[in-house]
């Protein structure tokens, strides 16, 4: 606890930790109340033999009753075991809608253990303690479920089926379902365990019969049975809401059948269960109970028979007319749940040929066109820029920096952080001292323009190498000077103590020098001067740290001094997750390097920060369609941008979706944790981008839900798909890519994330979806529709034309036969003026693992194909091929 407290204290967030502890404690204390009542109930049962009773349970009646008691306990234990596993593994996932999460391989083992525990008398005595402890543990671990249910605000949106606010589905439904599950499993266990206790009193098992429980015990059993019935009624009532987010045929949510048949039956069942519970508690009401049980059985039989009959006789013959209002609601809700209702739609009819006017109009697009894919650039970095075996470039991110003083359009670059990979240390260097005291951090990063290459075909660099040998270069072809790069991208003090690679704990500063970076054949050493870490200078702090980590060597390490601190959770996603466990941190973080004036709170000259994308999501949004069979999300928001200092480890959380009810609820619980996006320094905000993880989901949903007419949606005639392309010899789906282009004839180009789309089972281009990233337009979506009466070639078709071109296929064949491997890069489809331009970079590498070099650029306007060493050269050749021949006089 001391280490956790000190860790939160470095962010001045110890109040958040204290509040979480208090929420867990309060949840556990509240859970003790029903447990206390259950204990009192069980102690009230009289286990002594019923001598006065003349009525006995014998034969099959005794067997059936005993089996019922055992079955009740097994069902209860199955629910409890599932909740324990889920609460321990990911307690916040309970907020997505409770479900038993027992793996199939675990189910037989847990069932066998539960059966042995129920049947073995000594173990059975321990079961009440196990169930009580489990309920308290689950309730405490589910503190986030209770907190969100209490604090989530009204959204102002009401679903039309049960007229509940959407916030009920997003935040309160899970809490109610978990509460009913805990109470039901506890009540079932008490009923089954108490009944088994009465049935197995000596000599009942040897005689295989026992006296019927006396009046006092019968009243207690009836009271618990009535409680079980009330809880079943509550679950039945709550299950009506679950109809709103389960797929029923073509409708993502409750359709005509659910409203006309299923929901009324469930409401009727709820009333009947409550009446039966009341009858169970009333004395001398055996006839009433039997009649209610008969009515309940008839209702269930009618429900199971009437539903398929109604579907077959009424719904199927007139499905479209009956389901139209529900389809409209499903389309509207799905589009809102994934922000497709924010899309601005436009149309674009490209001209068949590229003209000089198009080139002038699209100059800013062409001057920033990405020719380097991340994969070949990373491959080059790993061979030329890792510099030591223990350095690693885990990923490369596309970004933009204001490098050109002449233009308003930032230069698009690819930035890759050089992190320390401790698993790559030589075996003799993997000592405890080296791993935790010496090799503590990575250093530096590379920055490359996306649109140029060197004379050897390899990437050019604005920033390369590291330490005092760091090379900062301008680019004459782009008109960028060295001073422009130095001004926009600081490189000094580029030690990366926190990154995206998983790293062990580090102790710094100590009496041992830390490896900083290599300089020629020598090494440069340093001592950590940042503000991160848990102090371990005092012997009591060292004892706490050694206990926390299970590392006794911290107690005897002579290199630790009074200023030493323990650096833990150095993977930036782990760092954010520890502070905000309710956020989903899907996707890779990306590094930015910004000038001093724009940094958040920092105690050093550090300029490097990681941006981590935080998502809120739910699988219980009314009438919204799930993303896929493997992804149950029905609601998704990129609600938080987390900024982590790469040197000091500070974490700041900025709310990027202030209208999201989920993040508003969490901001009510932890107001000191969040800041508005306006509070983010502008120099960091200039590097924000729509995460591909969100954009991919939006593209997935748009493929069906771009259709807003329920009749067209029902017919399924207008479904889109992501086109295919061949990359490095494999056919893959076209991934969304960043381009700098003009939006809807605007004069200035913007940094866009673009995804082309084609009709299902057809390769023609039908639309684009673009996410805007700059300024006040951040997060806006633009859908560009292409004319349906004019076929526009899709990426797969253009790539086929490229491979069929005699000149190009001849060159590719010569390279392949010459011992080299041709790698066709990502095919980009970009708007240039009034024309579409298809651009494919071609890389060449040795068959035995050589460096990929950018060798050719292939361009096409959809009719003509040209290839050259450079993009301007390829465009010139394309225009020469498309220009009409000049008429000559006689």
Curated annotation (Swiss-Prot):
What's a Pfam family in this record? UPF0182
InterPro entries of this UniProt entry? Answer: UPF0182
Primary location:
membrane
Q: How does it sit in the membrane?
A: Multi-pass membrane protein
What compartments host this protein? Cell membrane
Q: Which UniProt keywords apply?
A: Cell membrane, Membrane, Transmembrane, Transmembrane helix
A GO cellular component annotated for this chain's UniProt record is: plasma membrane
Which positions, given as ranges, span the membrane? 21-41, 64-84, 98-118, 134-154, 173-193, 219-239, 268-288, 295-315
| Family membership | Belongs to the UPF0182 family.
Q: What is this protein called?
A: UPF0182 protein SYNW1212
């Amino acid at each position: 606890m001391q280490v956790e407290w000190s860790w939160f204290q470095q962010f001045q967030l110890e109040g958040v930790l204290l509040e979480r502890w208090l929420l867990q404690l309060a949840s556990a204390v509240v859970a003790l109340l029903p447990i206390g009542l259950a204990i009192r109930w069980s102690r009230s049962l009289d286990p002594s033999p019923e001598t006065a009773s003349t009525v006995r349970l014998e034969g099959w009646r005794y067997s059936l009753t005993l089996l019922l008691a055992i079955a009740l306990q097994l069902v209860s234990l199955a629910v409890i075991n599932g909740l324990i596993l889920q609460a321990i593994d990911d307690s916040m996932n309970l907020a997505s809608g409770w479900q038993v999460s027992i793996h199939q391989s675990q189910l037989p083992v847990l069932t066998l253990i539960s059966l042995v525990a129920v049947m073995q008398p000594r173990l059975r005595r321990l079961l009440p303690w196990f169930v009580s402890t489990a309920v308290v543990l689950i309730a405490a671990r589910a503190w986030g479920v209770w907190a969100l249910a209490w604090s989530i605000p009204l959204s102002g949106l009401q679903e039309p089926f049960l007229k509940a606010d959407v916030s009920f589905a997003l935040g309160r439904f899970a809490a109610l379902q978990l509460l009913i599950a805990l109470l039901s499993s506890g009540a079932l266990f008490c009923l089954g365990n108490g009944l088994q206790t009465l049935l197995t009193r000596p000599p009942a098992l040897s005689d295989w019969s026992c006296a019927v429980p006396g009046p006092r015990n019968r009243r207690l059993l009836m009271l618990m049975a009535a409680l079980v019935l009330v809880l079943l009624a509550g679950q039945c009532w709550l299950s009506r809401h679950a109809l709103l987010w389960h797929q029923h045929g073509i409708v993502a949510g409750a359709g005509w059948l659910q409203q006309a048949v299923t929901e009324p039956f469930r409401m009727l069942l709820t009333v009947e269960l409550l009446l039966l519970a009341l009858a169970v508690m009333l004395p001398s009401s055996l006839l009433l109970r039997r009649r209610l049980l008969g009515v309940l059985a008839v209702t269930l039989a009618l429900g199971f028979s009437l539903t398929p009959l109604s579907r077959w006789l009424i719904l199927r013959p007139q499905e479209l007319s009956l389901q139209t209002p529900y389809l409209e609601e499903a389309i509207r809700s799905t589009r809102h749940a994934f922000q497709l209702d924010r899309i601005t739609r436009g149309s674009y009819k490209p001209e068949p040929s590229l003209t000089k006017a198009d080139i002038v109009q699209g100059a800013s697009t062409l001057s920033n066109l990405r020719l380097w894919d991340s994969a070949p650039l990373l491959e080059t970095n790993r061979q030329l820029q890792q510099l030591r075996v223990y350095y690693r470039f885990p990923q490369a991110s596309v970004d933009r920096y204001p490098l050109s003083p002449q233009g308003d359009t930032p230069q698009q670059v690819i930035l890759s952080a050089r992190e320390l990979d401790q698993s790559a240390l030589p075996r003799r260097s993997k000592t405890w001292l080296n791993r935790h005291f010496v090799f503590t951090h990575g250093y530096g990063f590379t920055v490359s323009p996306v649109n140029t290459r060197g004379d050897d075909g390899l990437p050019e660099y604005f920033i390369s190498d590291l330490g005092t040998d760091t090379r900062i270069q301008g680019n004459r072809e782009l008109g960028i000077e060295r001073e422009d790069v130095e001004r926009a991208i600081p490189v000094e003090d580029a030690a990366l103590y926190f990154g995206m690679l998983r790293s062990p704990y580090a102790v710094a500063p100590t009496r041992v020098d830390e490896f900083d970076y290599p300089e020629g054949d020598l090494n440069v050493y340093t001592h950590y001067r940042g503000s991160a870490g848990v102090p371990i200078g005092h012997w009591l702090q060292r004892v706490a740290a050694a206990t926390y980590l299970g590392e006794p060597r911290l107690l005897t390490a002579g290199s630790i001094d009074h200023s030493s601190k323990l650096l833990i959770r150095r993977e930036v996603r782990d760092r954010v997750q520890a502070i905000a466990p309710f956020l989903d941190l899907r996707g890779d973080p990306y590094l930015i390097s910004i000038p001093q004036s724009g940094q958040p709170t920092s105690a050093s000259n550090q300029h490097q920060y990681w941006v981590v994308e935080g998502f809120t999501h739910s699988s219980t949004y009314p009438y919204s369609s799930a993303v896929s069979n493997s992804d149950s999300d029905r609601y998704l928001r990129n609600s938080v941008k987390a900024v982590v200092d790469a040197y000091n480890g500070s974490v700041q959380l900025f709310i990027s979706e202030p209208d999201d009810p989920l993040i508003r609820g969490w901001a009510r619980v932890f107001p000191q944790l969040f800041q508005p996006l306006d509070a983010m320094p502008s120099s960091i905000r200039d590097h924000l981008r729509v995460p591909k993880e969100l954009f991919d989901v939006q593209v997935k949903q748009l493929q069906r839900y771009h259709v807003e007419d329920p009749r067209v949606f029902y017919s399924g005639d207008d479904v889109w798909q992501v086109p295919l392309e061949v990359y490095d010899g494999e056919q893959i789906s076209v991934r969304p890519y960043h381009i700098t282009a003009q939006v809807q004839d605007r004069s200035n180009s913007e940094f866009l994330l673009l995804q082309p789309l084609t009709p299902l089972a057809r390769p023609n281009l039908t639309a684009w979806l673009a996410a805007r990233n700059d300024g006040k337009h951040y997060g806006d979506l633009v859908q560009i529709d292409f004319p349906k009466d004019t076929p526009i070639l899709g990426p797969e078709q253009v790539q086929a034309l490229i491979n069929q071109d005699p000149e190009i296929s001849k060159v590719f064949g010569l390279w392949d036969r010459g011992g080299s491997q041709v790698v066709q890069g990502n095919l980009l489809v970009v708007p240039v003026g009034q024309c579409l331009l298809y651009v494919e970079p071609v890389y060449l590498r040795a068959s035995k693992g050589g460096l990929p070099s950018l060798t050719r650029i292939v361009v096409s306007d959809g009719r003509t194909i040209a290839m050259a060493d450079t993009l301007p050269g390829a465009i010139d050749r394309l225009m020469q091929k498309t220009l009409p021949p000049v008429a000559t006089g006689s």
